């Protein structure tokens, strides 16, 4: 065997491709042709080695042909222009994966490590925290961090005897690490990369990159956006800072930086707005865009919405020198304060303005020399009309109205694209290569929304019934208009504050738990009334005259209440999101019911045509993906894992020392955590199960099939058409049953095997505790099954 391996390695180093042999595989024919890997990957090499013994002559012949095809590629293949059929649907559309959400590029292990490091060394990562949070929240977290450090120092430095347990002081540290990890995973989709260099060299390099890209685009070259990023990332290494420099920069950033929402404009992806909904145009509002370029220097030149010159007239009359000067100044200011990623995002916005200037100037040049050609003119007017209408709709709207931004942008872009496609199809490709860049970057021209890219994008309409008071009217409505009305109804719903009040109460209870624990350990309930107020004060705070102990207790109380409140506030946000998902599902189910549609003030239509079924499936998948998805799932999964850990520790403590279980301070807190988290998880499971049940309700399709048979009876002449629709409804019912899955909490429960293992472990632990307390053997997992 050793000789075979040696010969295989020699053969592997000398031979490039495997030749077809007619004899049995020998020592020098052990590697298959598809494994052209380096010797560094030992696992793959051994896989190739042992796989060679399974091969036959036909497989080697096939591999030889595959290698030949790989060498030639598609260059010699005859190719014709083809187009994807936009009027057909894919299984991704029905499943919902066609409406993709932003995902982090790093694995969860790396994000967890980064979150822990950024919490432990909080002051040294102040720029990152300023970019992913607001300035007020950053100062609040900084104060809590310093107070926690002070509490640990006071606990270690005190010499007088006291009754303060160590868990009371270090307990908030674990919660701080958990919150930091959760926040790092939430913002991981558009967290700016750390700057690789500082100082004037970076500013000069960014300024040079900005000028270079503007001149290249003016010459018509197809430079990508990675030019600036590569210029920044290839420059030098990060310089080391002393502790004094860090705190001096922290003090400087505290009073001069506006770090409210810088990170949300750093990467050119679909941004997630304040209420959690995705804005597909790549930017939230004009206000958030301006926040990203604010600077403390008074002579900084920024670009306001009215100065950005989106309309055609301003683009035609704007001087190129002023445009390049503004681009240079903005790039300089951004690079000096926000790092390369944020400056890169802003320069993309500015470069597109310059791109429009150069494109219109080139259009004017073509029109001067070729007055009979209308293609450049139509292309320029189309892009200008689309961008100016979108800019006008955003400039006169507050930042909070994100849903109107979404739907108006969708409709504006759809109308502009449908009105200009027939005029500027070939000419724009030949004359304006910059338009191709905008076409590629435009999220409306990507493949995430296939039902928007038909011959009339976003304008495929179905006949729907709407109510105006007591009058019943019929109107042709598109998917965007129907979903917009559903969105308006969901946004107008007033959420309850019951769980928020419950979270506030739990925060206060967990903060007062150490005081109650010391009182219960010092005196009995009968003797509690016999003590004076001063004696109870001394017992609750653990000391009478020691200022260090009193300060430590007060600091621990403030930090504990604040961190617990933040965690339960995030759970309340997740509960509100789950409630909105349930409202989406309810209103979607009301579309095909006349009585419920009138009561809910949403349109009503029947699935009497194949086109209606297609729109119904598209609308169903789209509404399922609306709102926050991954960010809320991170919060829920963290609560789920925390609950499992708390329940496991409580069960272990009860099995080990159940007689003195309440004699430990941390056991009191674990019981309160277990009860409160269980209530929230039950709420999440209830809302999620109801939402899945609403979307998986096939009774709607069965009812529509009955309606088709009733219509066949009244109109026998349309029997063939109605039979076709009935068959499509049957196929849709089978497809939904195959694709839909029951609701499960995000995290480990998504894997059925791990879900069952976790379920058995928890139920086994609880069964052991109950059996030990009651005196007889009880197996809960058998009862549940």
Curated annotation (Swiss-Prot):
Q: Where is the PHTF domain?
A: 46-191
Which ranges are annotated Basic and acidic residues under compositional bias? 210-219, 391-400
Name any GO cellular component annotation: endoplasmic reticulum
Ranges annotated as biased composition (Basic residues): 200-209, 359-369
List the carbohydrate attachment sites: 329, 697, 756
Q: Which Pfam families match?
A: PHTF1-2_N
InterPro entries, per database record: PHTF1/2, PHTF1/2_N
Q: Which residue ranges run through the membrane?
A: 136-156, 164-184, 497-517, 553-573, 634-654, 668-688, 760-780
Q: Where is the composition biased (Polar residues)?
A: 220-239, 309-333
Q: How does it sit in the membrane?
A: Multi-pass membrane protein
Compositional bias (Low complexity) spans?
378-390
This protein's UniProt keywords: Glycoprotein, Membrane, Transmembrane, Transmembrane helix
Which residue stretches belong to region Disordered?
190-239, 304-401
Localization annotation: Membrane
* Protein's recorded name: Protein PHTF2
According to its UniProt entry, this protein's organism is Homo sapiens
